[in-house]
């Protein structure tokens, strides 16, 4: 039965859903990597698709930008459609010195300036972490494909245009790999509902060094990450 934000039918989604922020990126993934593709939802142009990858059922759906948006879609996928595994796929801005453009960053944990997980956990700090089995599978797949990978803590920011740029130096000191806007929220929802979640990111820019990928390199890096994510999805 459709939810307020997803007009798919029961059984339309696979147990594993790959989730980019951009719904057009979800469309690109479905058309480029999946076979026997069916579009299953389009409310608010937040497109979702289900198909097969190497013969196994996989879904892909956009989640929008920021923790409030992604939390709605992840909650409804798990609670209403029985999704078991959420794999966020996106980009991040690096802050640590050893993280380079085109690296793949896998979020073992996710710090945040958002209060959503404290609200969820009665005012206490909640350690927003990835599912270990998903994490291990993704790391092994990246290494098998010789994709440069960094594993560790990311930071999910509420503000894209931060008024406190000095925070990035503090992040670097504390070993944060890079900054996104969703991982901590997705990990919190998954934990709350008993599902598994992972975040896999490409490094599109380095915040402290002012480096940015060209559009061509950005696409290549995304495709490399997608192969890691898809192999993870069918090997868990």
From Swiss-Prot:
GO biological-process terms attached to the record: purine nucleoside catabolic process
Swiss-Prot/TrEMBL keywords: Glycosyltransferase, Transferase
Cellular component aspect of the GO annotation: cytosol
Pfam family, one: PNP_UDP_1
Positions that bind a purine D-ribonucleoside: 5, 180-182, 204-205
Positions of phosphate binding: 21, 25, 44, 88-91
Catalytic activity line of the entry: a purine D-ribonucleoside + phosphate = a purine nucleobase + alpha-D-ribose 1-phosphate; a purine 2'-deoxy-D-ribonucleoside + phosphate = a purine nucleobase + 2-deoxy-alpha-D-ribose 1-phosphate
Disulfide linkage: none
Oligomeric and partner information: Homohexamer; trimer of homodimers.
HAMAP family linked to this entry: Pur_nucleosid_phosp
Matching NCBIfam families: deoD, PRK05819.1, PRK13374.1
Name assigned to this protein: Purine nucleoside phosphorylase DeoD-type 2
Primary gene name: deoD2
């Amino acid at each position: 039965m459709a939810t307020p934000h997803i007009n798919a039918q029961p059984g339309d989604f696979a147990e594993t859903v790959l989730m980019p922020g951009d719904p057009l990126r979800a469309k690109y993934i479905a058309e480029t990597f999946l076979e026997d593709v069916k579009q299953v939802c389009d409310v608010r142009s937040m497109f979702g698709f289900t198909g097969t990858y190497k013969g196994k059922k996989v879904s892909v759906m956009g989640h929008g930008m920021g923790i409030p948006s992604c939390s709605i879609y992840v909650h409804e996928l798990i609670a209403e459609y029985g999704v078991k595994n959420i794999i966020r796929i996106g980009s991040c801005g690096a802050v640590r010195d050893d993280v380079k453009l085109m690296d793949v960053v896998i979020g073992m944990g996710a710090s945040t300036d958002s209060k959503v997980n404290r609200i969820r956990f009665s005012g206490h700090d909640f350690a927003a972490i990835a599912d270990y089995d998903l994490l291990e599978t993704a790391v092994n797949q990246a290494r098998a494909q010789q994709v440069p990978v960094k594993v560790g803590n990311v930071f999910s920011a509420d503000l894209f245009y931060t008024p406190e740029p000095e925070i990035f130096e503090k992040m670097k000191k504390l070993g944060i790999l890079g900054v996104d806007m969703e991982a901590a929220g997705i990990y919190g929802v998954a934990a709350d509902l008993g599902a598994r979640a992972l975040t896999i990111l490409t490094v599109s820019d380095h915040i402290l060094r002012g480096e940015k990928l060209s559009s061509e390199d950005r696409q290549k890096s995304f495709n490399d990450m997608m192969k890691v994510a898809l192999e993870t999805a069918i090997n868990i």
